[in-house]
Amino acid sequence: MKMKKIAAAMALSCLILSATAFAEEAQDRTVQQCFQKDELIVLDKQDVAGGKGTLHGLFSFTRDMAKPEQAIKEIGWMRLEKGSSIGLHKHGVNEDAYIIISGEGIFTDGDGNDTVVHAGDITIARAGQSHALRNEKDEPLIFLDVIAQNDGLQK
């Protein structure tokens, strides 16, 4: 019986230590300067902001990992397949830039104006502005998404 208690205590200690190591790794991720493709966090989201389909994402880090003093809260490679979209949504205190890498999309600004976007185009929604993006073409729409926030605006 004593051996079982010792083994259980050792297992619990290992579990606590490994959880602490993973927590530290997640916290340190936002100060990391280079992210290899195989290190990226896979995060797919459904029907984003009232849009349709799946938004496929590969992130260096996500906004829940960022510290208040870090302006860039999230960076990710994003992919929308044909028929998929990010619905029209308003940004409160953060800003969201899309850098189009490949494919063709339709960007909708806060006034409801549609603009066709291609590789090399950049869109941005500042705090207080709205935007949306959709893919109506057969080729996937690939873009880099950068979300930044000035936490001083919240005070």
Task: Say what each PLM segment does.
Residues F61-D64, G76-H91, A127:
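Conserved short histidine dyad/triad with adjacent acidic residue
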Residues P68-Q70, I86-H91, D109, R134-N135:
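Short histidine-centered beta-strand/loop micro-motifs
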Residues W77-E81, G92-F107:
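Short, conserved beta-strand element in jelly-roll/cupin
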Residues F22-I72, G87, Q154-K155:
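A short, N-terminal "cap"/entry segment at the start of jelly-roll beta-barrel domains
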Residues Q70, A127-L153:
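Ligand-binding loop in jelly-roll beta-barrel domains
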